[in-house]
């Protein structure tokens, strides 16, 4: 079975073709970073308009690269939420139009489930059960995953996501947009010991997170530097390194605690922050004494992408959790959508 998947929840337009038997066949991605840079962040209306321009050409590109025609597609999948309402509606409309034209089923997919399952696209594929660390600009959660559609929340951020802490801290340092990757690049040349920053909830004993206090601490350091003439290049690099070290230390500690509490030996890390090299290195070090292992999606699939949506749909089909009835062309999207809502075992 071949599924054509569409992702349009924020500022990336992604399309992919996945086979339930052969895996990922082709995928294409367009990022809107250049368009949003002058505004310092994502402008929802501009994002929606760009998705309209990109979705169909990307679909044609994917089909051509996979050597497929529309007649070869058996189902269509799309991100139904969470995300920006207008952006989600574009992806849903395009996917539903493809489905209607060919009389195919259209499968709505939860954006976070796409991220959560994306490391299964790579080899070696982790077996169930495992602990998942979902860490991005909008979400920071620890989940126990016992199978497709079988997710239990272990802990989550009580305020800001880790990715937001990266992005907002970078903006405070004048690093531009997108801030997280810029901060990580600058941190490579900095000394994290120069600035003492808090590790919020590091010793709380639970698996929840909080990053708002860290952002406030970074703001305080920036204002202190401004009173003395501002951050020079060395100080900016050191503050970036200290910020990254604080975020990563908390993520690693909570992930290790989750493995110990569950007794599991496999950790799946997904979401944009999963591309962070320091996080990957320190997790590998921390898990080694436990006899545990971390699994990451390929770097190209850490950001939002169509491959994870098509793949999540394929996994739901194989698990009997997706309706394959054609002719159900609802345009409902859910900008706010709890992952727990899809864990009851009913078709999406």
From Swiss-Prot:
Catalyzed reaction equations: L-threonylcarbamoyladenylate + adenosine(37) in tRNA = N(6)-L-threonylcarbamoyladenosine(37) in tRNA + AMP + H(+)
Amino acids binding substrate: 134-138, 167, 180, 276
Pfam family name, one: TsaD
CDD domains associated with the record: ASKHA_NBD_TsaD_bac (cd24133)
Enzyme class: transferase
GO biological process: tRNA threonylcarbamoyladenosine modification
Name of protein: tRNA N6-adenosine threonylcarbamoyltransferase
Protein encoded by which gene: tsaD
């Amino acid at each position: 079975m071949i599924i054509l998947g569409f992702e349009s929840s924020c500022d990336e337009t992604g399309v992919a073709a996945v086979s339930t038997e052969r895996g990922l066949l082709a995928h294409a991605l367009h990022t809107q970073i250049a368009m949003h840079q002058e505004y310092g962040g994502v402008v929802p209306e501009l994002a929606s308009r760009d998705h309209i321009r990109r979705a169909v050409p990307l679909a044609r590109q994917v089909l051509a690269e996979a050597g497929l025609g529309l007649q070869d597609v058996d189902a269509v999948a799309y991100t139904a939420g969470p995300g920006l309402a207008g952006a989600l509606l574009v992806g849903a409309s395009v996917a539903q139009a493809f489905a209607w034209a060919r009389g195919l089923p259209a499968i709505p997919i939860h954006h976070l489930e796409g991220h959560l399952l994306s490391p299964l696209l790579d080899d070696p594929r982790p077996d169930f059960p495992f602990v998942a660390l979902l860490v991005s600009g909008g979400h920071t959660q620890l989940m126990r995953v016992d199978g497709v559609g079988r997710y239990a929340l272990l802990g989550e951020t009580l305020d800001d996501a880790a990715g937001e802490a990266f992005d907002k801290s970078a903006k405070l340092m004048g690093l531009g947009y997108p801030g997280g990757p810029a901060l990580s690049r600058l941190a490579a040349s900095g000394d994290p010991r120069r600035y003492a920053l808090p590790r919020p909830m590091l010793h709380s004993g639970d698996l929840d997170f909080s990053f708002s206090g860290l952002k406030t601490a970074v703001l305080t350091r920036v204002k202190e530097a401004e009173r003395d003439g501002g951050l020079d290049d060395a100080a900016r690099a050191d503050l970036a390194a200290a910020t990254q070290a604080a975020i990563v230390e908390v993520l690693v500690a909570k992930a290790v605690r989750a493995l110990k509490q569950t007794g599991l030996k496999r950790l799946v890390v997904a979401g944009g922050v999963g591309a962070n090299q320091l996080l990957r290195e320190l997790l590998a070090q921390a898990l080694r004494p436990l006899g545990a292992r971390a699994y990451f999606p390929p770097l190209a699939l850490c950001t939002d992408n169509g491959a994870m949506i098509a793949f999540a749909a394929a996994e739901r089909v194989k698990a009997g959790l997706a309706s394959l009835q054609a002719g159900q062309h609802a345009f409902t999207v859910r900008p706010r959508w709890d992952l727990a809502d899809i864990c009851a075992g009913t078709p999406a």
